[in-house]
Protein backbone atom coordinates (compact mmCIF):
# COMPACT_ATOMS: atom_id res chain seq x y z
CA UNK A 1 0.00 0.00 0.00
CA UNK A 2 1.56 3.27 -1.16
CA UNK A 3 0.19 5.86 1.26
CA UNK A 4 1.88 8.75 -0.52
CA UNK A 5 0.17 7.85 -3.81
CA UNK A 6 -3.17 7.37 -2.03
CA UNK A 7 -2.80 10.85 -0.53
CA UNK A 8 -1.95 12.36 -3.94
CA UNK A 9 -4.92 10.65 -5.60
CA UNK A 10 -7.23 11.74 -2.78
CA UNK A 11 -6.03 15.34 -3.06
CA UNK A 12 -6.60 15.34 -6.82
CA UNK A 13 -10.11 13.93 -6.39
CA UNK A 14 -10.90 16.52 -3.71
CA UNK A 15 -9.49 19.29 -5.90
CA UNK A 16 -11.75 18.23 -8.76
CA UNK A 17 -14.73 18.08 -6.40
CA UNK A 18 -14.00 21.59 -5.13
CA UNK A 19 -13.76 22.74 -8.75
CA UNK A 20 -17.23 21.27 -9.29
CA UNK A 21 -18.57 23.03 -6.18
CA UNK A 22 -17.03 26.31 -7.34
CA UNK A 23 -18.67 25.82 -10.74
CA UNK A 24 -22.06 25.28 -9.06
CA UNK A 25 -21.58 28.46 -7.03
CA UNK A 26 -20.60 30.51 -10.09
CA UNK A 27 -23.50 29.06 -12.09
CA UNK A 28 -25.94 30.09 -9.35
CA UNK A 29 -24.50 33.60 -9.26
CA UNK A 30 -24.59 33.93 -13.04
CA UNK A 31 -28.13 32.57 -13.12
CA UNK A 32 -29.16 35.68 -11.20
CA UNK A 33 -26.91 38.24 -12.88
CA UNK A 34 -26.25 36.95 -16.41
CA UNK A 35 -28.51 34.04 -17.45
CA UNK A 36 -27.13 33.73 -21.02
CA UNK A 37 -23.58 33.36 -19.67
CA UNK A 38 -24.82 30.86 -17.08
CA UNK A 39 -26.37 28.81 -19.88
CA UNK A 40 -23.15 28.98 -21.89
CA UNK A 41 -21.07 27.88 -18.87
CA UNK A 42 -23.46 25.06 -18.07
CA UNK A 43 -23.39 23.79 -21.65
CA UNK A 44 -19.60 24.11 -21.81
CA UNK A 45 -19.15 22.25 -18.51
CA UNK A 46 -21.30 19.18 -19.17
CA UNK A 47 -19.14 16.08 -18.81
CA UNK A 48 -15.90 18.01 -18.32
CA UNK A 49 -15.52 18.54 -14.59
CA UNK A 50 -14.28 15.05 -13.65
CA UNK A 51 -10.71 16.33 -13.94
CA UNK A 52 -10.82 19.79 -12.38
CA UNK A 53 -7.47 20.95 -13.71
CA UNK A 54 -8.13 19.88 -17.29
CA UNK A 55 -11.52 21.60 -17.05
CA UNK A 56 -10.02 24.90 -15.84
CA UNK A 57 -7.31 24.72 -18.51
CA UNK A 58 -9.91 24.26 -21.25
CA UNK A 59 -12.13 27.00 -19.78
CA UNK A 60 -9.15 29.39 -19.84
CA UNK A 61 -8.98 28.93 -23.61
CA UNK A 62 -12.67 29.82 -24.01
CA UNK A 63 -13.49 32.26 -21.20
CA UNK A 64 -10.48 33.31 -19.09
CA UNK A 65 -12.59 35.52 -16.81
CA UNK A 66 -14.83 32.60 -15.88
CA UNK A 67 -11.82 30.34 -15.31
CA UNK A 68 -10.32 32.91 -12.94
CA UNK A 69 -13.64 33.31 -11.15
CA UNK A 70 -14.02 29.56 -10.65
CA UNK A 71 -10.42 29.29 -9.43
CA UNK A 72 -11.01 32.10 -6.92
CA UNK A 73 -14.20 30.51 -5.59
CA UNK A 74 -12.51 27.08 -5.45
CA UNK A 75 -9.63 28.50 -3.43
CA UNK A 76 -12.03 30.21 -1.03
CA UNK A 77 -13.99 26.98 -0.51
CA UNK A 78 -10.75 25.06 0.09
CA UNK A 79 -9.61 27.58 2.71
CA UNK A 80 -12.96 27.35 4.49
CA UNK A 81 -13.16 23.54 4.67
CA UNK A 82 -9.47 22.60 5.02
CA UNK A 83 -9.42 23.04 8.79
CA UNK A 84 -12.33 20.68 9.44
CA UNK A 85 -11.86 18.15 6.66
CA UNK A 86 -9.34 15.65 8.14
CA UNK A 87 -11.33 15.09 11.32
CA UNK A 88 -14.63 14.98 9.42
CA UNK A 89 -13.23 12.30 7.10
CA UNK A 90 -11.85 10.22 9.97
CA UNK A 91 -14.99 10.41 12.08
CA UNK A 92 -17.23 9.90 9.06
CA UNK A 93 -15.40 6.72 8.10
CA UNK A 94 -15.45 5.45 11.69
CA UNK A 95 -19.20 6.08 12.01
CA UNK A 96 -19.95 4.55 8.61
CA UNK A 97 -17.86 1.46 9.42
CA UNK A 98 -19.61 1.06 12.77
CA UNK A 99 -23.03 1.36 11.10
CA UNK A 100 -22.08 -1.17 8.41
CA UNK A 101 -20.88 -3.62 11.06
CA UNK A 102 -24.06 -3.14 13.08
CA UNK A 103 -26.26 -3.77 10.04
CA UNK A 104 -24.21 -6.83 9.11
CA UNK A 105 -24.55 -8.22 12.64
CA UNK A 106 -28.31 -7.59 12.57
CA UNK A 107 -28.60 -9.43 9.24
CA UNK A 108 -26.52 -12.33 10.53
CA UNK A 109 -28.56 -12.51 13.74
CA UNK A 110 -31.81 -12.37 11.78
CA UNK A 111 -30.61 -15.17 9.48
CA UNK A 112 -29.57 -17.29 12.46
CA UNK A 113 -32.96 -16.85 14.12
CA UNK A 114 -34.99 -17.49 10.97
CA UNK A 115 -32.94 -20.52 9.81
CA UNK A 116 -31.63 -22.29 12.90
CA UNK A 117 -29.07 -24.97 12.21
CA UNK A 118 -29.77 -28.57 13.35
CA UNK A 119 -27.12 -28.17 16.06
CA UNK A 120 -28.81 -25.07 17.47
CA UNK A 121 -32.21 -26.81 17.38
CA UNK A 122 -30.69 -29.78 19.20
CA UNK A 123 -29.12 -27.38 21.70
CA UNK A 124 -32.52 -25.73 22.27
CA UNK A 125 -34.13 -29.13 22.86
CA UNK A 126 -31.34 -30.08 25.27
CA UNK A 127 -31.72 -26.78 27.10
CA UNK A 128 -35.44 -27.33 27.59
CA UNK A 129 -34.81 -30.87 28.88
CA UNK A 130 -32.82 -29.37 31.76
CA UNK A 131 -35.90 -27.49 32.88
CA UNK A 132 -37.74 -30.72 33.67
Curated annotation (Swiss-Prot):
An RbcL-specific chaperone. The central cleft of the RbcX homodimer (RbcX2) binds the C-terminus of an RbcL monomer, stabilizing the C-terminus and probably preventing its reassociation with chaperonin GroEL-ES. At the same time the peripheral region of RbcX2 binds a second RbcL monomer, bridging the RbcL homodimers in the correct orientation. The RbcX2(2)-bound RbcL dimers then assemble into the RbcL8 core (RbcL8-(RbcX2)8). RbcS binding triggers the release of RbcX2. HAMAP family: RbcX. Residues 110-132 are annotated as: Disordered. Residues 111-132 have a biased composition (Polar residues). It comes from Nostoc sp. (strain PCC 7120 / SAG 25.82 / UTEX 2576). Belongs to the RbcX family. It is found in: Carboxysome; Cytoplasm. GO terms for cellular component: carboxysome; cytoplasm. GO terms for molecular function: protein folding chaperone. The homodimer has 2 functional domains, a central cleft essential for production of soluble RbcL in which the RbcL peptide binds, and a polar surface which plays a role in correct RbcL subunit arrangement. GO terms for biological process: carbon fixation; photosynthesis; ribulose bisphosphate carboxylase complex assembly. It comes from the Bacteria. Gene3D superfamilies: Chaperonin-like RbcX (1.10.1200.210). InterPro entries: Chaperonin_RbcX_sf, Chaperonin_RcbX, RbcX. This is RuBisCO chaperone RbcX. Keywords: Bacterial microcompartment, Carbon dioxide fixation, Carboxysome, Chaperone, Cytoplasm, Photosynthesis. Homodimer. Interacts with the exposed C-terminal peptide of RbcL via its central cleft, contacts a second RbcL monomer via its peripheral polar surface. RbcX and Raf1 can bind simultaneously to RbcL.
